[in-house]
Amino acid sequence: MMKLIQLCILFWCWRAICCHSCELTNITISVEKEECRFCISINTTWCAGYCYTRDLVYKDPARPNTQKVCTFKELVYETVRLPGCARHSDSLYTYPVATECHCGKCDSDSTDCTVRGLGPSYCSFSEMKE
């Protein structure tokens, strides 16, 4: 009986790790350009999920403590035309689409690594309804 309980606990721990890992997910983002004065919502894919991480009590200066986050490993770019743009302005908007995810260091050159970013649905202008 004890072996069965241990097996069940092991299974549930494995399931918790495997089923909530870093993976592609569908999201909706708001895109805008100042010349267009409108936001539109676009469906795309991005990375979401959990990565094993820890915060050490003793900070060893010789060994950096890098927290891993769920981020893209591969991405492509897609382009849409924004409606309502001024004449002679560039109405094209290019946005990233994740095609593969992994647990790795957050690259602040290409990603908002802050805890409280604006979020994917932030919009400065009114949203254009379809």
Swiss-Prot record:
Its main location: secreted. Heterodimer. The active follitropin is a heterodimer composed of an alpha chain/CGA shared with other hormones and a unique beta chain/FSHB shown here. Keywords: Disulfide bond, Glycoprotein, Hormone, Secreted, Signal. One of its GO terms (biological process) is regulation of osteoclast differentiation. It holds the Pfam family Cys_knot. This is Follitropin subunit beta. Residues 1-20 form the signal peptide. Disulfide bonds join C22-C70, C36-C85, C39-C123, C47-C101, C51-C103, C106-C113. Belongs to the glycoprotein hormones subunit beta family. Glycans are attached at N26, N43. The gene is Fshb. Together with the alpha chain CGA constitutes follitropin, the follicle-stimulating hormone, and provides its biological specificity to the hormone heterodimer. Binds FSHR, a G protein-coupled receptor, on target cells to activate downstream signaling pathways. Follitropin is involved in follicle development and spermatogenesis in reproductive organs.
